[in-house]
Amino acid sequence: MLIGHTNIKKRDLVLDIGAGSGVITSALSKRCQKVIAIEPDKTALEKLRKNTKNLENVEIVPEDFLMMDLPETPYKIFANPPFHLSSKILHKLIEAKNPPDAIYLILQKQFALKLLNTDRHYTSQLGYALTAKYQTKIRYPLKPYDFTPPPAVPTVLFEAKKI
């Protein structure tokens, strides 16, 4: 599982942004102290509640992540957000009063490359802002068959760890 490619530990608080049906949430619950599963969609919420009802360390927040307050205690992010929201999510995280200790996002590869501070890739303004606070890298390339339905573009597990 992808979570094995992270530094998420048993003592961690982890936010799952856009938790959907709870596949990632359920896996995270086995690896960390508490998962906050954030999901605004009512249909997905029903599935999420059903799939996580026996997981005592999961808290479901039925809100839009972009509108909610972030924790004041240390936390990490692991999410498979809609690609069109990736930039807004990262902006919110790095501009937060208490930014996360680590960010793990499943991203479109082309977008993730712009977040790296390397000589080989054009780094975006967001990438420069991110790399001022975080060490960034592509943790793991993903295959289309890792998803249902498969994405139309190459995807990666992106990591940003606080410097």
Predicted regions located by residue number:
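Catalytic cores of RNA-modifying enzymes
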Residues: 1-163
